[in-house]
From Swiss-Prot:
It is an enzyme of class 5 (isomerase). One of its GO terms (molecular function) is intracellularly ATP-gated chloride channel activity. It comes from Plecturocebus moloch. This is Cystic fibrosis transmembrane conductance regulator. One of its GO terms (biological process) is membrane hyperpolarization. Residues 1386-1480 are annotated as: Interaction with GORASP2. The modification Phosphoserine is found at S549, S660, S670, S686, S700, S712, S737, S753, S768, S790, S795, S813, S1444, S1456. ATP 1 binds at W401, S434, G458, S459, T460, G461, A462, G463, K464, T465, Q493. A motif (PDZ-binding) lies at residues 1478-1480.
Length: 1480
């Protein structure tokens, strides 16, 4: 970054913001880079500001029982805040005084008062000086208040982050990431931009009092008619606002529901294509969109009327103020024009400035209270350690994760026991509470000496991780004692990678020791991986390790723990993502050799690890099931494998036990405090099973291992499904969390490809921070996108006499939408994370505008209609101008107002009714035309938004995976959430505002030019200057906003990264270092934001200066060239003030339109994506010259003779696959053949290309070569026909929000009887029947109430229903317990006995049924043979098998005597799905 010119700028340069000219000039000429941004002043650095506020907050905590954060803020910022407030008040006073001078200038043209004509020139100078003074006061005041707001935000940002690092784990378990992000974005943004409005809470009342006094001198008591109208208008708009909120709350549910399905579609786009569900998903989303648009239109119409009411109130407030006085006493022109100017200022103060100020204070104080409560939460307390201790001892330790744990569930039980099903039975969700009040650890005892290895094992939820947390001090024991030295190193069960190099991640702030570093690298099997990078271990890893696989991240995390020289090493399931061979080598070389002299506690379920451990501790439901050696375990607990590792069959449990299991599963997702609801209602509600979890902790069942991102939406009211929605008295609440998840090779936050080895965004319930910390981070990280842009407040339509501050206020209202409820109005996704999915030009191109306008055939006609209506309004206004300009020549004998002022009288006794009728007629005309002229435009623009959404959705679903691989999941979801919300809400009214303002300016210029042609000559260069200035500023401002967005992303990225690795940070004591990194991220964002504020102020001030110059010219031209007639001067000066303020706002509005049209540009980019290819060969060459019915069975009535494929034979020739066109080959020259009905297993190490081969079979990649199925080539049929030949069980199971039946048969081709039959075949029937509504039970959050095994059975049922002849299985047993695995094996034998099966597996025993095996190494086929031949040859396959005890199963593979598995073969490896369900 460069040094800021502000440091050496003069006072004049600072006053006029001239120091920003270099960056403006550079941005206009070329693309700005981060290096072009100026350094921030030292006073704005996060270090200084946070230290200042932290000092005052500590002082507040120490001095009072009830500390107030606002007091600390007051001591830091109050005096500067008040100084700029006084400047702002003085600027507003000048605005109130201007009408007085205008009235005196008009009075000087009174024919009977020629003595004052000579002072008109001086009055004009005074009026112009007022404008100059106001400009010099207003802009520094606004900038200063912005600056203070920015400093307050930075200081509180830092304070919140520091507090986050200190929070206890119990507190972290009660709050969600969404709440933290909201605290840092939504709440603090209120200070950043809203502070400029805060002073109007006292300025506006003073201004109203001053104006009322001045108008009283003109109109006396009739002024209260105008004031009363403004008050009624404010109440009317408040009523419209409530109506708009009602529609908005209803619409929020529909938006959430659509985005739920959309995000699930994006997350699982590869599965959607594999299942050929494009049409079903498109229809489902479009149906939801239709319902949403109905409410969108209603809300838009209400906002439009609200906007129109304010715009046209200016005419009526003058009309009602003047008319009573005029009818009684008559009135002169001077009073009319003076009153018009006064009423404009009065209207803004009453209906805008004061309500906005009150709202700002309300929101700000609410935000301060929330932050204050957060800062007072319980902090993490380190345990007292004995540094001389060499042993680790735990005596009679009992612990709870939450105090009052039992009370929480007692309350839930009491609340939900009142629920009854429709037939009177107890609600299934809460029929059993066996786990209420259970401690996470109970009476734990063990002792290990220095250098010993303790292996901790146990079933899911046994408390293994909690045991390590208690040793680390993260969990405080309620009973018992813990004794160890305190020098701890820790490796989490989910690898955590911080942004930086591999070396920095391993060393992690510890002093560098070359020999130790190399030894650790070698022991953790990282040498080969590091050698592949050009930068070796200095390669910079993205957030979460974007360039690494899951196994590499796991080994780096282990290396970090091993590198630190500690007395005690806590290793929490470090081998979960390693293949058998790598795991074996690392365990031997690292855990057993390199760390042989260290005390180690290893959480594992591997039998090999238990055998080599000095001591074994097996936990069961938080209690110690066994403690001793392995030989003692075999003698004392021979049944430990079946009892603790889940080997019992669910179907063999008693009915009470089955009910308890299901109850516990469902209980975790039940809605606390819901009103009673019947199951018949439940099946009509798509989200009844989830909801707001309140502030109390609920146990978590997290989603599967391969989720990359989770899109969390929690809604207090049930969302609509099938057009039915339950009424609720509570407002809808929308919360979105940033809950990082993971997938191989993927990055944290937005920098993730849509498809790599997993999906992108998954809808799920809100998670606590603790759950996020204990969630998988090995697979890519999740970003929870906030989707509330569509619910923001939309500003009211501008009026003709806005000041720059008024314009800013309206811009603030439009952009930020300050709402009382943070949950409803959490900032949009892009407010927190930069969406850099593609490069959009800094300024929207004309082609985008043209394409947008021509998208709907009616839009052009609607624009012409608006122009015609405007001309009619101009004609009506000319009637008033004619009246004002000509009534001064009435016969003075008709005057009763003044005997000597005949030319000044316009209202007389004889003409009063005539004039009254004219005013009423004009008012009615303006009211009718103004209220309804924009409705067709708003309606049509929403229709255009509907068309764009439909085209974009269709384009995404039909786009090839090679294109989607180049996109980021966050970018896709942003198009459907943020950009569609802009198209629905902001763009229609913003375009209407701009068109309206533009026409007003044109009309006013035309009128003034007719009255005084010389003024037209002054107008032309001014308009040209505005246009040039806009073009000059727009290039730089848009780039600065992009850089600011890019600078915002690291702040929230760092927050999420820190929280995910918080236990590691504390174990290593790296909190100060991460605070420094956070301050750097804040300073980077501050540099961009401060420069944007400065350049914006430069632009606004230059507009104001041009306006002042123009007004000076108009004033003196009108004074010097106008002869008799005060009416002409009054019209010219009044309209001149209106022209420039309106033109000023029109320029700003055009900038807003350009900014919003960038959303249209991004949508067009998606619409223009290529579509998947069509057949390139004729189908007539097959089967005797004719391919009979190239189709898959899609209903049960198709004759077998007409079915393709009929046998399932596959021939693969020279298959080469790439993720993207022109990229590196990920499969090369693959050739082999599969006989009909044969079962083929794919073998190879992680990353060898097994899953990629299955994707290539489905034509999901860029492929070359040829594949034939039963003689039909893949380029001879459509993609839909080809993919329907396969049944698929993917690695990432796709369960979308909908009923069981919809998930099994989305096209609704099969009857309930047929679905039940298939469910019975695959073992799903007993599961589905446990749920209320059975097939109509609505699954949400990716099927969160189902185990991963049940989800796999769902996929198996889909394949059975498809009647596919070829079945592709990608790691189907990766997360299965033995029981579910046996169900799948049985179903495969029965339902797919005559089908071709291709199986990709890591577990050797899962592939015993395969006849042939394809070994893939380095993206090529190395071997393709039977299992016996592979074992007899030297190969990687034989090497891996030799290291597994399961090899003894192979001799029995074909033996009829083999009936059962050995009782103790292996402890089941705890998979991520199970870990996610762990109740710590």
């Amino acid at each position: 970054m460069q040094r800021s010119p502000l440091e050496k700028a003069s006072v004049v340069s600072k006053l006029f913001f001239s120091w920003t000219r270099p960056i403006l000039k550079k941005g206009y000429r070329q693309r700005l880079e981060l290096s072009d941004i100026y350094q921030i002043p030292s006073a704005d650095s996060a270090d200084n500001l946070s230290e200042k506020l932290e000092r005052e907050w500590d002082r507040e905590l120490a001095s009072k029982k009830n500390p107030k954060l606002i007091n600390a803020l007051r001591r830091c910022f109050f005096w500067r805040f008040m100084f700029y407030g006084i400047l702002l008040y003085l600027g507003e006073v000048t605005k109130a005084v201007q009408p007085l001078l205008l009235g005196r200038i008009i009075a000087s043209y009174d024919p009977d008062n020629k003595t004052e004509r000579s002072i008109a020139i001086y009055l004009g100078i005074g009026l112009c000086l007022l404008f100059i003074v106001r400009t010099l006061l207003l802009h520094p005041a606004i900038f200063g208040l912005h600056h203070i707001g920015m400093q307050m935000r930075i200081a509180m940002f830092s304070l919140i982050y520091k507090k986050t690092l200190k929070l206890s784990s119990r507190v972290l378990d009660k709050i969600s990431i969404g709440q933290l992000v909201s605290l840092l974005s939504n709440n603090l943004n209120k200070f950043d931009e809203g502070l400029a409005l805060a002073h109007f809470v006292w300025i506006a009342p003073l201004q109203v009092a001053l104006l009322m006094g001045l108008i009283w001198e003109l109109l006396q008591a009739s002024v209260f008619c105008g004031l009363g109208f403004l008050i009624v208008l404010a109440l009317f708009q408040a009523g419209l606002g409530r109506m708009m909120m009602k529609y908005r709350d209803q619409r929020a549910g529909k938006i959430n529901e659509r985005l739920v399905i959309t995000s699930e579609m994006i997350e699982n786009i590869q599965s959607v294509k594999a299942y050929c569900w494009e049409e079903a998903m498109e229809k489902m989303i479009e149906n939801l969109r239709q319902t949403e648009l109905k409410l969108t239109r209603k809300a838009a119409y209400v906002r439009y009327f609200n906007s129109s009411a304010f715009f046209f109130s200016g005419f009526f407030v003058v009309f009602l103020s003047v008319l009573p006085y005029a009818l009684i006493k008559g009135i002169i022109l001077r009073k009319i024009f003076t009153t018009i100017s006064f009423c404009i200022v009065l209207r803004m103060a009453v209906t805008r400035q004061f309500p906005w100020a009150v709202q700002t204070w309300y929101d700000s104080l609410g935000a301060i209270n929330k932050i204050q409560d957060f800062l007072q939460k319980q902090e993490y307390k380190t345990l007292e350690y004995n540094l001389t201790t060499t042993e680790v001892v735990m005596e009679n330790v009992t612990a709870f994760w939450e105090e009052g744990f039992g009370e929480l569930f007692e309350k839930a039980k009491q609340s939900n026991n009142n629920r009854k099903t429709s037939n009177g039975h107890d609600n299934l969700f809460f029929s059993n509470f066996s786990l209420l009040g259970t401690p996470v650890l109970k009476d734990i005892n063990f002792k290990i000496e220095r250098g010993q290895l303790l292996a901790v094992a146990g079933s899911t939820g046994a408390g293994k991780t909690s045991l390590l947390m208690m040793i680390m001090g993260e969990l405080e024991p309620s009973e018992g004692k813990i004794k160890h030295s305190g020098r701890i190193s820790f490796c989490s069960q989910f690898s955590w990678i911080m942004p930086g190099t591999i070396k920095e991640n391993i060393i992690f702030g510890v002093s560098y020791d070359e020999y130790r570093y190399r030894s650790v690298i070698k022991a953790c099997q990282l040498e080969e991986d590091i050698s592949k990078f050009a930068e070796k271990d200095n390669i910079v890893l993205g957030e979460g390790g974007i360039t690494l696989s899951g196994g590499q991240r796991a080994r780096i995390s282990l290396a970090r723990a091993v590198y630190k020289d500690a007395d005690l090493y806590l290793l929490d399931s470090p081998f979960g993502y390693l293949d058998v061979l790598t795991e074996k080598e690392i365990f031997e070389s690292c855990v057993c050799k390199l760390m042989a002299n260290k005390t180690r506690i290893l959480v594992t379920s591997k039998m090999e690890h238990l055998k080599k451990a000095d001591k074994i501790l097996i936990l069961h439901e938080g209690s110690s099931y066994f403690y001793g050696t392995f030989s003692e375990l075999q003698n004392l607990r021979p049944d430990f494998s079946s009892k603790l590792m889940g080997y019992d069959s669910f179907d063999q449990f008693s009915s009470e036990r089955r009910n308890s299991i299901l109850t516990e599963t469902l209980r975790r997702f039940s809605l606390e405090g819901d009103a009673p609801v019947s199951w018949t209602e439940t099946k009509k509600q798509s989200f009844k099973q989830t909801g707001e979890f309140g502030e109390k902790r609920k146990n978590s069942i997290l989603n599967s291992i391969n989720s990359i991102r989770k899109f969390s939406i929690v809604h207090k009211t049930p969302l609509q499904m099938n057009g039915i929605e339950e009424d609720s008295d509570e407002p809808s609440e929308r919360r979105l969390s940033l809950i990082p998840d993971s997938e191989q090779g993927e990055a944290i936050l937005p920098r993730i490809s849509v498809i790599n080895t997993g999906p992108a965004l998954q809808v799920r319930r809100r998670q606590s921070v603790l759950n996020m910390m204990t969630h998988s981070v090995n697979q890519g990280q999740s970003v929870h996108r906030k989707t509330t842009a569509s619910t923001r407040k939309v500003s009211l339509a501008p009026q003709a006499n806005l000041t720059e501050l008024d314009i800013y206020s309206r811009r603030l209202s439009q952009e930020t939408g300050l709402e009382i409820s943070e949950e409803i109005n959490e900032e949009d996704l892009k407010e927190c994370f930069f969406d850099d999915m593609e490069s959009i030009p800094a300024v929207t191109t004309w082609n985008t505008y043209l394409r947008y306008i021509t998208l709907h055939k009616s839009l052009i006609f609607v624009l012409i209609w608006c122009l015609v209506i405007f001309l009619a309004e101009v004609a009506a206004s000319l009637v008033v101008l004619w009246l004002l300009g000509n009534t001064s020549f009435q016969d003075k004998g008709n005057s009763t107002y003044s005997r000597n002022n005949s030319y000044a009288v316009i209202i007389t006794n004889t003409s009063s009714y005539y004039v009254f009728y004219i005013y009423v007629g004009v008012a009615d005309t303006l009211l009718a035309l103004g209220f309804f002229r924009g409705l067709p435009l708003v309606h049509t623009l929403i229709t255009v938004s509907k068309i764009l959404h439909h085209k974009m959705l269709h384009s995404v679903l039909q786009a090839p995976m090679s294109t989607l691989n180049t996109l980021k999941a966050g970018g896709i979801l942003n198009r459907f959430s943020k950009d569609i919300a802009i198209l629905d809400d902001l763009l229609p009214l913003t375009i209407f505002d701009f068109i309206q303002l533009l026409l007003i300016v044109i009309g006013a210029i035309a009128v003034v030019s007719v009255l005084q042609p010389y003024i037209f000559l002054a107008t032309v260069p001014v308009i040209a200057a505005f246009i040039l200035l806009r073009a000059y500023f727009l290039q730089t401002s848009q780039q600065l906003k992009q850089l600011e967005s890019a600078g915002r992303s690291p702040i929230f990225t760092h927050l999420v990264t820190s929280l995910k690795g918080l236990w590691t940070l504390r174990a290593f004591g790296r909190q100060p270092y991460f605070e420094t990194l956070f301050h750097k991220a804040l300073n980077l964002h501050t540099a961009n934001w401060f420069l944007y504020l400065s350049t914006l102020r430069w632009f606004q001030m230059r507009i104001e200066m041009i306006f002042v110059i123009f007004f000076i010219a108009v004033t003196f031209i009108s004074i010097l060239t106008t002869g008799e007639g005060e009416g002409t001067v009054g019209i010219i000066l009044t309209l001149a003030m209106n022209i420039m303020s309106t033109l000023q706002w029109a320029v700003n509005s055009s900038i807003d339109v350009d900014s919003l049209m960038r959303s249209v540009s991004r949508v067009f980019k998606f619409i223009d994506m290529p579509t998947e290819g069509k057949p390139t060969k004729s189908t007539k060459a097959y089967k005797n010259g004719q391919l009979s019915k190239v189709m898959i069975i899609e209903n049960s009535h198709v004759k077998k003779d007409d079915i393709w494929p009929s046998g399932g034979q596959m021939t693969i020739k020279d298959l080469t696959a790439k993720y993207i066109e022109g990229g590196n080959a990920i499969l090369e020259n693959i050739s082999f053949s599969i006989s009909p009905g044969q079962r083929v297993g794919l073998l190879g190490r992680t990353g060898s290309g097994k899953s990629t081969l299955l994707s290539a079979f489905l034509r999901l990649l860029n492929t070359e070569g040829e594949i034939q199925i039963d003689g039909v080539s893949w380029d001879s049929v459509t993609l839909q026909q080809w993919r329907k030949a396969f049944g698929v069980i993917p690695q990432k199971v796709f369960i979308f929000t909908g009923t069981f039946r919809k998930n099994l048969d989305p096209y609704e081709q099969w009857s309930d009887q047929e679905v039940w039959k298939v469910a019975d075949e695959v073992g799903l029937r007993s599961v589905i029947e446990q749920f209320p509504g059975k097939l109509d039970f609505v699954l949400v959050d990716g099927g969160c109430v189902l185990s991963h095994g049940h989800k796999q059975l769902m996929c198996l049922a889909r394949s059975v229903l498809s009647k596919a002849k070829i079945l592709l299985l990608d790691e189907p047993s990766a997360h299965l317990d033995p029981v579910t695995y046996q169900i799948i094996r049985r179903a495969l034998k029965q339902a797919f006995a005559d089908c071709t099966v291709i199986l990709c597996e890591h577990r050797i025993e899962a592939m015993l049924e395969c006849q042939q095996f394809l070994v893939i190494e380095e993206n090529k086929v190395r071997q393709y043979d039977s299992i016996q031949k592979l074992l007899n040859e030297k190969s990687l396959f034989q090497q891996a098998i030799s290291h597994s005890d399961r090899v003894k199963l192979f001799p029995h593979r074909n033996s009829s005597k083999y009936k059962s598995r050995p009782q103790i073969a292996s402890l089941k490896e705890e998979t991520e799905e199970e870990v996610q369900e762990t109740r710590l």
